[in-house]
C-alpha cells in the first residue's frame, strides 16, 4: 500500500541571485531546512512534481494544459541543475494512462525540458535533482488561455488515485506562487525577439540569458523599493488560499475564476495550480493534516513565499 506525503513550496530564481537580504534568505532557508528534514524522514521511493514552466520547455507553438514527462532534463537556468532527471519511464506512462482513463486530458513528453520551477525544489529538498526517481507533471500557469481551476484539482485527484495503487512511499511536490506578478512576456506585449522565444522556443544565447537575469535582478530591486509598476503582493489573499489548503476545503477553489486569481494575486499567481494539484493528489487518499506552515511576503523575490508539508491524517 502506498504512503503519500506532500511538500509544496514557492520558487524564485532570485534565491540564487544577488539582491535578497541575508535576513530574508536565512528565514526562508530555516523553513526549507525543516521541510528538508521532513522529506529526509519520509524517505520517498518516488517523487511526483507539479510545476509550471517559464517558456523554457513549453511554448505557444504547442501549449498543453497538462503534460507528464516520461523522460526529462533540466535546462540549467539560474544556476539550477542542467542535464537528465531520473524519470521512471514505465511508471510515468502508467500514470499518464491512468489520468486519461479518469477523464482528464493530459499530454506526454518523451523529452521534457524543465526549468527552475521543477528543479529548484528538488535541489532544495534533496540537495541533488537526481537524488530520487521523479515524474515531472507540467501545469500551464502562464500562457493564456488557462483552463478552470477545477480541472487542475481533477488532475491531482486522478494522479493521487493512481499513486495509491503503488507499493511505494511517494512524495508529491507543488512548486510555485503565491501572489506575484513578475515581468513575463505575453503574446500581446512581447517584442519580436521575445515573441519568437515564447511561440517557437527560439534558443537563447548566453548573452541573452545574462541580460534576462540582469533584468530580473533590476525588477526585483525596483519592486522591493516601491519603484515598480508591477502588481503588489497580496498577503491577505495568500492567507485565504493557505487556509483553504490547511483546512482541506479544496472544492471551494472550484469557484475561483482565472480573472479573480489574476486580479487578486497577479498574473503569475496562477502557479497556485501546482499546489492545488498536489493537495488534491494527497486528499485522494483521505483527510490530511499540514505540518510546516511557513509564509512570508517577500518583495525582494517578487513573491508571497510559502512552504507547506502534509501527510494523511
UniProtKB/Swiss-Prot annotation:
The keyword Oxidoreductase applies. Pathway: Aromatic compound metabolism; 3-phenylpropanoate degradation. Its EC number is 1.13.11.16. The active site is at residues 116, 180. GO terms for molecular function: 3-carboxyethylcatechol 2,3-dioxygenase activity; ferrous iron binding. Belongs to the LigB/MhpB extradiol dioxygenase family. Homotetramer. This is 2,3-dihydroxyphenylpropionate/2,3-dihydroxicinnamic acid 1,2-dioxygenase. The lineage of its organism: Bacteria, Bacillati, Actinomycetota, Actinomycetes, Mycobacteriales. The gene is mhpB.
Amino acid at each position: 500500500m502506498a504512503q503519500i506525503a506532500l511538500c509544496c513550496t514557492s520558487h524564485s530564481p532570485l534565491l540564487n541571485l544577488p539582491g535578497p537580504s541575508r535576513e530574508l534568505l536565512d528565514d526562508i532557508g530555516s523553513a526549507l531546512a525543516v521541510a528538508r528534514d521532513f522529506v529526509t524522514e519520509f524517505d520517498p521511493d518516488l517523487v511526483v512534481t507539479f510545476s509550471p514552466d517559464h517558456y523554457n520547455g513549453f511554448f505557444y507553438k504547442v501549449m498543453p494544459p497538462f503534460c507528464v514527462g516520461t523522460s526529462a532534463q533540466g535546462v540549467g537556468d539560474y544556476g539550477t541543475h542542467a542535464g537528465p532527471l531520473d524519470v521512471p519511464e514505465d511508471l510515468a506512462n502508467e500514470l499518464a494512462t491512468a489520468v486519461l482513463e479518469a477523464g482528464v486530458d493530459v499530454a506526454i513528453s518523451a523529452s521534457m525540458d524543465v526549468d527552475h520551477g521543477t528543479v529548484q525544489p528538488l535541489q532544495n529538498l534533496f540537495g541533488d535533482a537526481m537524488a530520487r526517481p521523479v515524474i515531472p507533471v507540467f501545469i500551464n500557469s502562464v500562457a493564456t488561455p488557462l483552463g478552470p481551476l477545477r480541472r487542475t484539482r481533477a488532475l491531482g485527484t486522478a494522479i493521487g488515485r493512481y499513486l495509491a495503487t503503488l507499493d511505494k512511499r511517494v512524495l508529491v511536490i507543488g512548486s510555485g506562487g503565491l501572489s506575484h506578478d513578475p515581468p513575463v512576456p505575453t503574446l500581446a506585449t512581447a517584442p519580436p525577439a521575445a515573441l519568437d522565444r515564447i511561440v517557437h522556443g527560439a534558443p537563447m544565447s548566453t548573452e541573452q540569458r545574462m541580460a534576462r537575469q540582469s533584468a530580473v535582478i533590476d525588477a526585483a530591486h525596483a519592486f522591493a523599493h516601491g519603484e515598480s509598476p508591477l502588481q503588489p503582493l497580496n498577503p491577505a489573499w495568500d492567507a485565504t488560499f493557505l487556509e483553504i489548503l490547511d483546512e482541506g476545503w479544496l472544492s471551494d477553489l472550484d469557484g475561483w475564476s482565472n480573472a479573480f486569481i489574476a486580479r487578486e494575486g497577479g498574473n503569475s499567481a496562477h502557479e497556485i495550480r501546482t499546489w492545488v494539484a498536489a493537495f488534491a493528489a494527497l486528499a485522494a487518499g483521505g483527510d490530511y493534516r499540514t505540518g510546516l506552515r511557513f509564509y512570508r511576503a517577500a518583495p525582494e523575490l517578487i513573491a508571497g513565499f510559502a512552504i507547506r508539508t502534509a501527510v494523511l491524517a
